[in-house]
Amino acid sequence: MFKYIGDIVKGTGTQLRSLVMVFGHGFRKRDTLQYPEEQVYLPPRYRGRIVLTRDPDGEERCVACNLCAVACPVGCISLQKAETEDGRWYPDFFRINFSRCIFCGLCEEACPTTAIQLTPDFEMADFKRQDLVYEKEDLLISGPGKNPDYNFYRVAGMAIGGKPKGSAQNEAEPINVKSLLP
């Protein structure tokens, strides 16, 4: 008999403790946001929409090395290389299927020219899957992105617009390798 009374007291205590917890949470600040009217806080390194950036000179940074497509775990990036008269590579087409993209950021890490960058833009919803396939024209932005002073071809040692090799920033004079032969 006393066992049953103990169970009743224990159950009543559990119920009262639950009610106190519910009423206590009723007066706390709400975590829910009215989304379109109230903007969501995004952390500083939030990975959202992928963009292609330009050099400080206004040229495309992408050199079509295909490292981003190889690094992508879901295979949503496709591109094809083309070459200008002066030997500079650029993507003939660059396509990202955002319906497959998981926004992991591996393409940004693999890019040697910092051409691919992830922005905090996340509002990309659409009614048709075909509209989530972005071409190069949709991805290119007019600015340099996160690294405004970086120019891959000035650092890589390729002659720029009539300047001889060795005159770019932090670049040593070219070495005549034939003089090193015995």
UniProtKB/Swiss-Prot annotation:
Top-level EC class: translocase
Entries under InterPro entries matching the protein: 4Fe4S_Fe-S-bd (IPR017896), 4Fe4S_Fe_S_CS (IPR017900), NADH_quinone_OxRdtase_chainI (IPR010226)
Positions of [4Fe-4S] cluster 2 binding: C72, C101, C104, C107
EC no.?
7.1.1.-
Q: Which residues are noted in the entry as [4Fe-4S] cluster 1-binding?
A: C62, C65, C68, C111
Q: Which family does it belong to?
A: Belongs to the complex I 23 kDa subunit family.
Q: How does it assemble?
A: NDH-1 is composed of 13 different subunits. Subunits NuoA, H, J, K, L, M, N constitute the membrane sector of the complex.
Q: What is this protein called?
A: NADH-quinone oxidoreductase subunit I
**What organism is this sequence from?**
Pseudomonas savastanoi pv. phaseolicola (strain 1448A / Race 6) (Pseudomonas syringae pv. phaseolicola (strain 1448A / Race 6))
